[in-house]
Amino acid sequence: MTFILSGFADEISPDLDDQLAILGAESISHLELRSVWSTNVADLSGSQLASFRHALDDAGVRVSAIGSPIGKIELEAPLGPELERMRCVADIASELGTQIVRVFSFFVPPGAPPERHRRQVIDRMFALTEIAEDRGLILAHENEKEIYGDRPERCADLITAVGSPAFRATFDAANFVQCGVQPHTEGYGLLRPYLVYLQVKDALAATGEVVPAGQGDGQVGETLSALRDSGFEGYVSLEPHLGEAGRYGGFSGPQGFRRAAQALKALLDELSISYQ
């Protein structure tokens, strides 16, 4: 089984040429598009998209997924504008030749049990999923801190409640660690039936600090091994967050991204997992 390496190239630099240079240096042939030229993917103009696509074609790089911001808003915010952004992102995904769009399940109001908002979240995710179904896309839900689906049991419940093959899961070990979860022990078994994508960063349980893969408490090696043994073939996407980590993104810089890439490849080699 082969894993395909990818990464959030905006963690390298806002500049596309810089991004492609580092991806090439690390022999990574795909990227996950979250932003470029300091512009979020959902806000890219037609001319920017055309320039982006032509540059990737020239470099021999493809898009593994759209790292969209969809669902990373307050639960009480109006849904209509988010559905419009989802349609825009769907157009971009189709134009760039990828089927996978990362999404989130909304920031829940603090101080109340998240389960109190379950029905509202399900309804919103179902509305987003209907757009994906119409466009032939797969929404990959990321377990993000402070959203409804921040823990494995709520992620799994949400996916089963929506009940569509167009709504699946991506797995972020560091985010689980920062929520007090042992990612592989507590999360992998629940979410493996729905996993279509893996985002790679690790974290220390004691402090929440983000570290390269295999250097924290995220049980990344265990998850990689289990995915291989289960027959997973798909994208393993670096999201290093080694320089900055905020609510809406992160940054590593060229050397930080390379350090994260080399740590992941060393871990895959140690586990005898093939990748390209």
PLM feature segments, named:
Residues 32, 65-67, 102, 140, ...:
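Conserved beta-strand positions in the central sheet of alpha/beta enzyme cores
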Residues 14-21, 55-58, 74-169, 178, ...:
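Active-site acidic/histidine proton-transfer and metal-coordination neighborhood
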Residues 42-46, 75-80, 112-117, 180-183, ...:
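Short, solvent-exposed loop/turn segments at secondary-structure boundaries
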